[in-house]
Amino acid sequence: MKKKYFGTDGIRGKVGEFPITPEFFLRLGYAVGKVLLASDWKLAADKRPTILIGKDTRISGYMLESALEAGFSAAGVDVLLSGPLPTPAVAYLVRALRIQAGAVISASHNPFYDNGIKFFSSEGSKLPDSMELQIEAELDFPIETAPSIKLGRVQRLKDEEGRYIEFCKSTFPNQLDLRGWKIVVDCANGADYQVAGHVMHELGADVVTIHANPDGFNINHECGATHIMTLQGAVLQHGADFGIAVDGDGDRVLMVSGEGVVYDGDSLAYIIAKHRQQRGVLQGGVVGTLMTNLAVEQAFERIGIPFARANVGDRYVSELLQQNDWYLGAENSGHIICRDKHTTGDGIISALQVLYALRDTGLMFADLMHDVTFFPQRLINVKISRDFDFQNDQAVEICKNEAEQALGNDGRILLRASGTEPLIRVMVEGKDPQQIEYWAEKIAGTIQQQAVASTVGH
């Protein structure tokens, strides 16, 4: 069954436009509350299910939180409120507090005028599809407020940042520290603004924190993991050893070397995997996505680490890790999942695993990545006016096959429809920049031509 509201990462959209409205969040809170009440938690007779609400630093977070809280309370579910808190912190606290669910009001790396929501199960992982469908079914029913004696209580959680800081530090070996390193931390004016710098500082680093002054509007604005040039400049300006950039909700990370070179999720996962293999603690292989650079796949093959590709989206990376019983997965955008450390992608914890590899080996980024030369990638977004079935179009298929033959084993072609916009993404990867440019343009042109022809034909 197709979901109506939930996408690959919860519900997201523009604030004030359905479904990112107070009215919908009130109904959503009530619907989630009813689903939680219908589950068998084996709670004591006088106990109700409890949900923790976290949010990032967007101005709209408080408005949506109030609506959501009212919905939960009306259904008869207890609520714990926190201040701005990274997404992975909510996932951790749900488990640590032994409560039934968590909700995060955030649109991750999007601008301030967008917002959204995602939920975590009692295990601290994203909700299964079946539960999201149950919630959507419940949304069709009107709100019937629980009797006053059964209304949910609302309390504010204390020292949530402190608990999470200690959890992050616990994933770094006790016998090591970050002394002697100068690290610039870009908090993206987001949910990590009171956390990321403190973690690095308490582990001994000399920390320069930037973009840790959220005003409700500046989240992700020319800063953080989606605008890495700012961090590159700051690392060079401060003469730092490294830079760490998270995104607005703290679930992804990119890093920068002292020379100002950017290392994406693919590179960071490679460093972590190689270090774990050397220490004999890499369990299984590594999961990447359809966007993972072919050079990384080939490098894993050379050093004997199994590698598998999932669809784009941290949910799919997580699912494939569980299926294979592997522990390390990543997207090039910086979502890195270390399943032995946390249930979900965590920017700070992932950065700490990389810093552990650097500290433990005494090597730097360039040393650990010397055996990987990234293949050039050319990405073209082709705008289409209506649903065009490119997968079953003969001309597109012929053009793609020709390109695949020309590129051979040292190239890759990926065509995929955007999940949010009327676009088809064409990605061609190979060793020769001119060759991939030629084929990317040719395939994109063919798709454009066929899409127009199919519109005219209708």
Curated annotation (Swiss-Prot):
Enzyme Commission code: 5.4.2.10
A Pfam family it matches: PGM_PMM_IV
Similarity remark: Belongs to the phosphohexose mutase family.
Enzyme type, top EC level: isomerase
Gene name of the record: glmM
Catalysed transformations (reactions): alpha-D-glucosamine 1-phosphate = D-glucosamine 6-phosphate
Protein name: Phosphoglucosamine mutase
Cofactor stoichiometry and binding remark: Binds 1 Mg(2+) ion per subunit.
GO terms for MF: magnesium ion binding; phosphoglucosamine mutase activity; phosphomannomutase activity
Modified residues (Phosphoserine): 108
Coiled-coil region: none
HAMAP family: GlmM_B
Organism: Nitrosomonas eutropha (strain DSM 101675 / C91 / Nm57)
Modification after translation, per record: Activated by phosphorylation.
Example of a GO cellular component annotation carried by this entry: cytosol
PANTHER family assigned: PHOSPHOGLUCOMUTASE (ALPHA-D-GLUCOSE-1,6-BISPHOSPHATE-DEPENDENT) (PTHR42946:SF1), PHOSPHOHEXOSE MUTASE (PTHR42946)
Gene3D superfamilies recorded: Alpha-D-Glucose-1,6-Bisphosphate, subunit A, domain 3, Alpha-D-phosphohexomutase, C-terminal domain
Active-site residue list: 108 (phosphoserine intermediate)
Record lineage: Bacteria, Pseudomonadati, Pseudomonadota, Betaproteobacteria, Nitrosomonadales
Keyword Magnesium found: yes
Keywords noted in UniProt: Isomerase, Magnesium, Metal-binding, Phosphoprotein
Physiological role: Catalyzes the conversion of glucosamine-6-phosphate to glucosamine-1-phosphate.
Annotated positions binding Mg(2+): 108, 247, 249, 251
